[in-house]
């Protein structure tokens, strides 16, 4: 989008469309003893606060103060994940999976089963010095979490190596109906699934909804043909084919 409001925080949109034969996809409920494997990029402080940071108003000075909120993408690592998931031998091992977004380990792994025990010390780090909270909420990109049966875990780890992907067993499905996280031998999170599913205490607020004003844009040109060409010449409307062919190619 070409707009003065995006000078400091530019907007780029990219997408990948994938397809897998239905016979190669499992959709199963995790059972106690299943293993959660984290694969892809390592975890760092980049991404801590990313979900809220992306909604802030930014200016030129934001680069200095908010640079760590959203990580610069690592396209080659993403490509390796895509290549791995094209392998039917891999997808047939996966009971359930999640990508990492807002909330990091807490959400991406925390959503996979009702009862979970996560060992944060096993989460691969980009550098030392991260505490348990940072490991739990970091939104570092290029990461996936998959649930596999205990007997399939070693095979999955070996298959990940074929794409030069780092994969680590970091959590186990339990029958406790609680989400627990351990760091340096201490249990730092112990929350019941019943509470998590409640979304917390009820919140109420008063809002005033105003009707949006219609956008009236005058188009230069005497004839419809001239107006059409002038519209097509607008950077926000013209073909983006050139960009799409260069992006992550």
Enumerate the predicted regions with their spans.
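Glycine/proline-enriched, intrinsically flexible loops and inter-domain linkers
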Residues: 1-249
